[in-house]
Structures are given as structure tokens and as C-alpha cells.
């Protein structure tokens, strides 16, 4: 009953726009966290011919990608050695997070007689994962000279890309530039990549050999960006449900847990079978909006695990059981878009979409 409708045409159009924007740079499409909540398998199936790599957070996500298509997949996270035989046999790209990873990985490569493709992750200022900047060149050279590793890429991640004027962006870019110069001195074929969506939109000269357009591919734009071409990018999904019951309040009655919403006599409420148990934000209860038959209605009362209610007022537009309810709109300016919901709940679109769980059906249209 609860369905996330995904437009394959919009997804593909978004990726084509990005490809045009970044020129010759390769596309590494992040599909971690169930493709930001959109459904990993469906997204991979309908995008693989447009991208060069897929990127995931862990090995189980990598396996899911490869169950759909044979395509280069890189893991951003740590090397999970309990799966190393399958990582090697499937040519999954792994990230070197520390100098010591090289020797350990070499031992497994020798044992299985299989050279893995590696990307060296560098900490240029985010201070989360990756080889320390001061140890970068030594690590890159060691990986490049290894007889048992194939150094395919070198990358880092911007800490403040969502704020294009933040001085850390320039600091990280300058550090990465010096590493790129060293790396290209070893081989021009090593893929250097730094930018996520906000990175290459907010900073000049930052595409390098490859970009990693995650949130942009799914249709979400930074507020600061007004480029005409990029503005053609649109959200690819909308979340739908159905009205399952219409309730008419009597005088003095309320609705939901603690009865915090008190309506008027004769007020009608629509019950929608989706709640925080589906990953829909609980904070929206009593302040969010849904669209029923092109009319916006406010949520009423606390959201429960499995349901929410909306006020229809006197139901002048004759909402009925089984009418379609749009909970997340694909139109950014709407009051129920992921952008608007994120603003209401003090979070980001990534959070709104990626927390939608498997109780919600994903459907390509």
C-alpha cells in the first residue's frame, strides 16, 4: 500500500545532465544505504549503462550491485577481510585506509593468487577515514610499487562542500592537488577523485578524473546553485499511500496518542497507514502536510509506528477511502517535498530518503 514511485526517465536524465556538466570526468555513482533509500537494485538496473563505477559503503552492498550487473564497484569503508575471497574473485575495489592495510592485503592476494584493485583514501581535512595527509605520498608509492596490488585510484572527501565559501574547501583542494601531482608522476592512468555533488557544483577545477554525484543524481540540489542546466535536475521519486478510513469527530474528541490534537465537532480525519515504523519522520506529526487529490491537508496529532491522521476539515473536496495520498512530492517547492520535510524536521534530504525502510515498496515507473 505504501509505494515509493521512482521515475527511471528522470534518473537517467539527471545522470546525463551531470555527465554533460563534468565533461570528460568519469562517473562513480554512489548507491550506498539502499541507493539513498530509493532501492539499490532498481537504481543500478536503470543507470548502469550511464556510469563508470558504482560506490557503496560495505561489501554486502557491493554484492547486491554485482547481483544486478557486472560493473566496477568500489567500497568506501574498511576492508572486511572475512569476505576477502569473494572481494578478490569479484574484482571489488577496496579502499586503503591506512599504510598497514597494504601489507595485510598483499598477504591475502598472494594466498588467493589474485591482485585486488585498490583506491587509496586520503584524509585531507575531514578527519574521519583515510591515510593521514602527511603519509599520503609514501602510501601511494608503496601501493603503486606492490607486486600484488593494482593501484587504480586515489581519492579524498570534502568536509564542507555544502558551504562553497568555507575556507576548508580550498585547503583540502590544495592538499589534494599536491597529491595528484605526485600520483600522476607515477602513472597518468591512476584515477584521482575528490568531488561529491556539492563539491563539483561549488568549486571550480575540482572534477579531476572522476566525480561521485550521489544526492544530485537522485534529484536534490544545493540551495546555493542556480546554473540553468543543473536546474533541470529533478527528484526521481515520490512516496504514495492510500486513505484507509475516514473518521468524524464528535464534540470534545481528539485523535492519536495523548490526544494532543483536538478537533471541532463534525471535523473529518483521514487515516493513512504509514508511520515512523516505515522510516517516515515522526517529527512531522501535527505539523506536516500531505497531498490528496491535489489539495494539501495538515497532519493532525502524533504519528504512530504504523499510521498517521490528517485533517480534512469539513471534507469539502469529498476525500474517500482508497484515494491516493502523496506523502513526499517530487516537486521541490511543494510543502511535502523531501526538501520541505527536511526543513521542517531540521535535517537534510539524505536523511529523509535514506531512512525509508523495506516496509515501503519501491516501484519503477
Swiss-Prot record:
Record-level Gene Ontology MF annotations: alanine racemase activity; pyridoxal phosphate binding
This protein's UniProt keywords: Isomerase, Pyridoxal phosphate
Residues forming the catalytic site: 32 (proton acceptor), 257 (proton acceptor)
Modification N6-(pyridoxal phosphate)lysine, positions: 32
Catalytic activity entry: L-alanine = D-alanine
NCBIfam families membership: alr
Similarity comment: Belongs to the alanine racemase family.
Residues bound to substrate: 128, 305
Role this protein plays: Catalyzes the interconversion of L-alanine and D-alanine. May also act on other amino acids.
Name of the top EC class for this enzyme: isomerase
InterPro entries cross-referenced by the UniProt entry: Ala_racemase (IPR000821), Ala_racemase/Decarboxylase_C (IPR009006), Ala_racemase_C (IPR011079), Ala_racemase_N (IPR001608), PLP-binding_barrel (IPR029066)
Alphabetized PANTHER family for the sequence: ALANINE RACEMASE, ALANINE RACEMASE, CATABOLIC-RELATED
Name the UniProt record assigns to this protein: Alanine racemase
Entry's EC annotation: 5.1.1.1
Organism of provenance: Francisella tularensis subsp. novicida (strain U112)
GO CC annotation terms, alphabetical: cytosol
Pathway(s) annotated for this protein in UniProt: Amino-acid biosynthesis; D-alanine biosynthesis; D-alanine from L-alanine: step 1/1
Co-factor requirement: pyridoxal 5'-phosphate
